């Protein structure tokens, strides 16, 4: 049941739920669902954030997308998940596309170098800097794991 009273949906919970064989979603509307249902059934309450929506349908889209994309074969390359935000308590590094120069801003030279080791180190340092600056809570978790 998607509820602001529930456990917060994060990447770890999404991973855990992606391994379940079946998931049923109860979408409340305005005030929620009858409390007796929650008390008499084995229902896990899950929150997608600290805000209120008119109904659980919108929240269910977020919930489902977070889980479904982790299923084998849904993404073209399952290894791509490893570098995404939250996988190692870090936010993802900046992304760049073509053209190489756009509005006087260029793609960093290291990304054009072809040196996979340098690119890997650049991505890690960027992820660390972004996380440290924008999400001190994640940075703290990362430093503990490291």
Predicted feature descriptions by range:
Residues 33, 37-84:
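Structured adenosyl-cofactor binding patch, chiefly the S-adenosyl-L-methionine
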Residues 99-146:
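SAM-dependent methyltransferases
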Residues 58, 70-109:
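Internal, active-site/partner-interface "lid" segment
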Residues 24, 45, 51-52, 100, ...:
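Short glycine- and Lys/Arg-enriched binding-loop motifs that mark or flank ligand-binding interfaces
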């Amino acid at each position: 049941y998607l509820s602001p009273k529930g456990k917060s949906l994060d990447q770890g919970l999404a991973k855990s739920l992606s391994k379940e064989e079946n998931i049923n979603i109860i979408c409340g509307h305005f005030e929620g669902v009858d409390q007796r249902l929650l008390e008499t059934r084995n229902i896990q309450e899950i929150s997608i954030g600290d805000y209120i929506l008119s109904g659980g349908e919108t929240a269910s889209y977020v919930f489902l997308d977070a889980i479904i994309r982790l299923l084998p074969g849904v993404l073209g390359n399952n290894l791509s998940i490893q570098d995404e935000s939250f996988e190692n308590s870090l936010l993802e590094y900046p992304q760049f596309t073509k053209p190489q120069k756009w509005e006087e801003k260029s793609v960093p030279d290291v990304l054009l170098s072809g040196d996979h080791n340098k690119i890997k180190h650049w991505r890690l340092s960027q992820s660390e800097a972004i996380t440290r600056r924008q999400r001190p809570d994640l940075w703290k978790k990362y430093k503990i794991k490291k």
